[in-house]
């Protein structure tokens, strides 16, 4: 394998790299015999890195001849201090990287605490040559993510950007134009559904080409194929970057280095807790009017169709029967049925129902059975009741579902400090789905100050194609995105949809990840309009075309002064590691992320880029992974940016406050401290799609700054000692990469 290439040295990946990437993909998906290129084992003591083999390899490589000047340079850097280096007033001549490190903040608001200093930790058990390869690979991987995030107006943290620019020898230019835009909350007395201020029609022409919506000034420009200069993603560049990352996560030295750094991060946090736990607690005790109960926390991953608990649903069914027994609520091909007649048809009476007979709760029977889990969305096993109570498009125009959601929202408002981001479904089966959903939203006036909304797109093209609902995959993409583009260009012609889009913060991609498509996304893959087969495209195929259209859409909406959207897919709950690799490239944040424990390289990259992960241990416990084996605590200790979420309260929770139930169980099982829980709660607010104004209110005016400078303990109840530890540890790991690259100059 050739050495990894830096971005400035050309990005063309040769045939050997592509061939290697295909071999890695095949070995994982087809379960080839022998040793897998991507380790299927947890990153723990059982990680198959042979100690004797590694020691022998290092001993052999160290004895090989190497450039003396480079060796002396590395030897001179064998001591790396954990603490923030000297201040800007130092008279010592510094390199551009050292100048940045030394100008880090001095934390006037952080109490003194005990730090750990590591000496001789320059290459984490890999040879000098391997260390260079590792640093180049990690550097380019971070550059890849930064590129895709900025192009699509998604989030990439400032700190790694500073290190990347200093490695390039450039100054970081603070540019807030790359930030996503969320709709601010309505002012007092202002109608959140107002349509008076909708922008005028731009008159642009739209055309889908190769699965991506292209925007033209007019029809004549469309005929000449002269689109407006928006950042249309380049498929060849994406595939080259994807192949590079596939090769990177399978490289032995990179896996060894990442595995050792992750073990170091875990051990280091445990030492930090042992030394500073009481000092952190002292900070929190001295913080007036703030504790875990009254710091803001957001349910960053919850599905609207299951946002209520089972008792709430049962109570609503009985209440609706008491009030509307003689109301016509359901229609069949033969006749229309009243609510009383519908229950008679199902041979049941609402007053005889219990939470057990409702049978919507996931149990032992759903473990590793996603098909059985989906059946739990049908109360009493009856699809008629699901259509009536949990759907937006039915005979009564989704009135019951809207009422249930309003009641859940009222509970959140009553709790005051809890927020949620429910997902509503767009399937892509027909182009009028958006109009129906937005009409339901606006007509029922579904607004709650403690809720923001997301759109989930189920990956079920194969189902629609087998029933001949769609001619090809491109039509599904067109049904999903074209109405949104049209409403953005001409809001006044689509008032309901334009208002609805103001309340949407992102797109999610959902389905059972354990279903393998066996297809590797490559330059030979059919274009979406050519994908006429009944097989489902791969996860990466779905993700790329969703990202590509969101990127163009965000550029258009940003130009119009409208809110933009994030790409926040379900990822890593099951299935191949290529899902997580794709998310690292193009997703703002993900839900689940369990499979990160199987890839030390991806896990380390998620740490370096601080990619938010919404974890749902109770959901995983019923479907894929026992609670005690959940990597939540391991990820938290290492410093990954994780939050807690409920996923489906109807299936997994029992109480009126499912998010608090999730925190309470995690705190008991994992023995979390108050500071731990408040840190997770703060992460959830940073991860979510609520507006800048609300985040500034909940977290402090400086929340966009990283480290203790951006933490207001009076609002977050997170100790400044913890924030300083997290920031210094993060900078330490980024600095190792910078030092490794500097030594190769």
Swiss-Prot record:
Q: What is its EC number?
A: 3.5.4.6
For this UniProt record, the keywords arranged alphabetically read as follows: Hydrolase, Metal-binding, Nucleotide metabolism, Phosphoprotein, Zinc
- What does the record give under GO molecular function? AMP deaminase activity; identical protein binding; metal ion binding
Read off the SUPFAM superfamilies from this record: Metallo-dependent hydrolases
**A GO BP term, please?**
IMP salvage
* Leader sequence segment: none
In this protein, the active site sits at 592 (proton acceptor)
- Write down the Pfam families for this protein, in alphabetical order: AMP_deaminase
Give binding positions for substrate: 303, 372-377, 573, 648-651
Cofactor(s) needed for function: Zn(2+)
- Reaction(s) catalysed by this chain's protein: AMP + H2O + H(+) = IMP + NH4(+)
Q: How is the cofactor bound?
A: Binds 1 zinc ion per subunit.
Q: Which residues carry this modification: Phosphoserine?
A: 83, 439
Sites binding Zn(2+) sit at 301, 303, 570, 647
- Modified positions (Phosphotyrosine) are 214
Residues that the record marks as modified (Phosphothreonine) are: 79
Q: In which pathway does it act?
A: Purine metabolism; IMP biosynthesis via salvage pathway; IMP from AMP: step 1/1
Name the family. Answer: Belongs to the metallo-dependent hydrolases superfamily. Adenosine and AMP deaminases family.
- What is the documented function of this protein? AMP deaminase plays a critical role in energy metabolism.
NCBIfam families found in the cross-reference section: AMP_deaminase (TIGR01429)
Describe the protein's quaternary organization and the partners it interacts with. Homotetramer.
Protein name per Swiss-Prot or TrEMBL: AMP deaminase 1
Top-level taxonomy: Eukaryota, Metazoa, Chordata, Craniata, Vertebrata
């Amino acid at each position: 394998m050739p050495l990894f290439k830096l971005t400035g040295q050309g990005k063309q990946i040769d045939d050997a790299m592509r061939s290697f990437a295909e071999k890695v993909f095949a070995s994982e998906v087809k379960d080839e015999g022998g040793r897998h290129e991507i380790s299927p084992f947890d990153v723990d003591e059982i990680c198959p890195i042979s100690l004797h083999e590694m020691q022998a390899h290092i001993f052999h490589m160290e004895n090989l001849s190497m450039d003396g000047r480079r060796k002396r340079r590395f030897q001179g850097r064998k001591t790396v201090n954990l603490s923030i280096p000297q201040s800007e007033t130092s008279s010592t001549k510094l390199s551009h990287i050292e100048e940045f490190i030394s100008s880090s903040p001095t934390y006037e608001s952080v109490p003194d605490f005990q730090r750990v200093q590591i000496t001789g930790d320059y290459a984490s058990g890999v040879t000098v040559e391997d260390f260079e390869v590792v640093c180049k690979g990690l550097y380019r991987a971070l550059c890849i993510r930064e590129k895709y995030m900025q192009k699509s107006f998604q989030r990439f943290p400032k700190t790694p950007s500073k290190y990347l620019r200093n490695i390039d020898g450039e100054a970081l230019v603070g540019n807030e134009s790359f930030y996503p835009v969320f709709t601010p909350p309505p002012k007092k007395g202002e109608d959140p559904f107002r349509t008076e201020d909708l922008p005028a029609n731009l008159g642009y022409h739209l055309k889908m080409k190769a699965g991506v919506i292209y925007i033209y000034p007019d029809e004549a420009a469309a005929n000449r194929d002269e689109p407006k200069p928006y950042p249309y993603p380049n498929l060849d560049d994406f595939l080259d970057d994807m192949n590079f990352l596939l090769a990177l996560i399978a490289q032995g030295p990179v896996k060894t280095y990442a595995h050792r750094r992750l073990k170091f991060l875990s051990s280091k946090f445990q030492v930090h807790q042992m030394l500073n736990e009481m000092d952190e607690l002292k900070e929190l005790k001295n913080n007036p009017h703030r504790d875990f109960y009254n710091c803001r926390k957001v349910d960053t991953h919850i599905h609207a169709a299951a946002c209520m608990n089972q008792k709430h649903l049962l109570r609503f069914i009985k209440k609706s029967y008491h009030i509307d027994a003689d109301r016509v609520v359901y229609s069949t091909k033969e006749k229309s049925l009243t609510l009383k007649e519908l229950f008679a048809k199902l041979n049941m009476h609402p007053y005889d129902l219990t939470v057990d007979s409702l049978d919507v709760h996931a149990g032992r029977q759903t473990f590793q059975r996603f098909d059985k889990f989906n059946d739990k969305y049908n109360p009493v096993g009856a699809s008629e009741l699901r259509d009536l109570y949990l759907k937006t498009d039915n005979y009564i125009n989704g009135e019951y579902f809207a009422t249930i959601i309003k009641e859940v929202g009222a509970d959140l408002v009553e709790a005051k400090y809890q927020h949620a981001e429910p997902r509503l479904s767009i399937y892509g089966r027909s182009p009028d789905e958006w109009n129906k959903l937005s009409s339901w939203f606006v007509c029922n006036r579904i607004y709650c100050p403690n809720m923001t909304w997301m759109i989930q797109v189920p990956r079920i093209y194969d189902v629609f194609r087998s029933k001949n609902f769609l001619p090809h995959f491109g039509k599904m993409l067109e049904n999903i995105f074209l109405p949104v583009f049209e409403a953005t260009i001409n809001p006044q012609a689509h008032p309901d949809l334009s208002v609805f889009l103001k309340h949407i913060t992102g797109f999610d991609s959902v389905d059972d990840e354990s279903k393998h498509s066996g297809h590797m996304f490559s330059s030979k893959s059919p274009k979406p309009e050519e994908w006429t087969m009944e097989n489902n495209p791969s996860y990466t195929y779905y993700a790329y075309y969703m990202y590509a259209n969101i990127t163009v859409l965000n550029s258009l909406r940003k130009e119009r002064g409208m809110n933009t959207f994030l790409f926040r897919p379900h990822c890593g709950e099951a299935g191949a590691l290529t899902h997580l690799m794709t998310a690292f490239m193009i997703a703002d944040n993900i839900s689940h992320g369990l499979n990160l424990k199987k890839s030390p390289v991806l896990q380390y990259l998620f740490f370096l880029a601080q990619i938010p992960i919404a974890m749902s241990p109770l959901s995983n416990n019923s479907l894929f992974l026992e609670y005690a084996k959940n990597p939540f605590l391991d990820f938290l200790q290492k410093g990954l940016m994780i939050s807690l979420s409920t996923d489906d309260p109807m299936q997994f929770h029992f109480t009126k406050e499912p998010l608090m139930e999730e925190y309470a169980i995690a705190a008991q099982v994992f023995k979390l401290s108050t500071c731990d829980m408040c840190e997770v709660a703060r992460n959830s607010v940073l991860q979510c799609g609520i507006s800048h104004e609300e985040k500034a209110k909940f977290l402090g005016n400086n929340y966009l700054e990283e480290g203790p400078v951006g933490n207001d303990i009076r609002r977050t109840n997170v100790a400044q000692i913890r924030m300083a530890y997290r920031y210094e540890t993060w900078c330490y790991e980024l600095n190792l990469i910078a030092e490794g690259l500097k030594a190769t100059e």
